[in-house]
């Protein structure tokens, strides 16, 4: 499976002892080559990439090990996904996961202005600012509608036109 993946991706093997050398900007997949590695993965839980993407080729009991590891990780609130099955589907899924990873990393350090608050009957529409910062590195800032109206009243049509000319869609 790894030989086939190298036709589509740059594959760098990192020994589990060097997992702490990976940066948050490195897209990482954990290759479960054999059964019996469950304890090893659990021992390095804090260093694992999040979410944990587990690749199993079905050889040497690797799928059973990946299932066991995934179940253990999910039991501790960590998202995980197992890549296993037909190679073309696995390759497509890796492309999607990588694209999602790049998009998420591009949000890191961004600030998002929040205008207004959800209506009281919307019980699941509140944003957990602290969780968003921890998970994605995004900072939410409350912006009062009075401040928006103030800026709206000060802006000229020429300034709007100039700002719109800078937007490339």
Identify what each model region corresponds to.
Residues 14-108, 118-128:
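Cofactor- and metal-binding active-site motifs of prokaryotic enzymes
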Residues 8-16, 80-84, 138-144:
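Short beta-strand elements in bilobed, periplasmic/extracellular small-molecule ligand-binding domains
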């Amino acid at each position: 499976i790894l030989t086939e993946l190298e036709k589509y991706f740059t594959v760098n093997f990192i020994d589990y002892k060097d997992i702490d050398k990976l940066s948050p900007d490195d897209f990482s997949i954990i290759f479960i080559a054999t059964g019996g590695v469950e304890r090893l993965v659990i021992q390095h839980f804090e260093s694992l990439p999040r979410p944990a993407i587990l690749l199993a080729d079905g050889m040497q009991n690797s799928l059973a090990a990946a299932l066991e590891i995934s179940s253990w990780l999910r039991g501790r609130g960590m998202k995980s996904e197992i890549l296993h099955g037909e190679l073309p589907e696995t390759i497509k899924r890796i492309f999607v996961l990588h694209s999602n990873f790049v998009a998420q990393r591009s949000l890191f350090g961004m600030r998002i202005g929040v205008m207004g608050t959800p209506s009281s009957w919307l019980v699941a529409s509140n944003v957990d600012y602290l969780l968003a910062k921890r998970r994605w590195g995004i900072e939410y800032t409350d912006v009062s509608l009075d401040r928006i109206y103030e800026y709206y009243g000060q802006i000229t049509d020429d300034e709007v036109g100039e700002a719109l000319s800078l937007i490339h869609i």
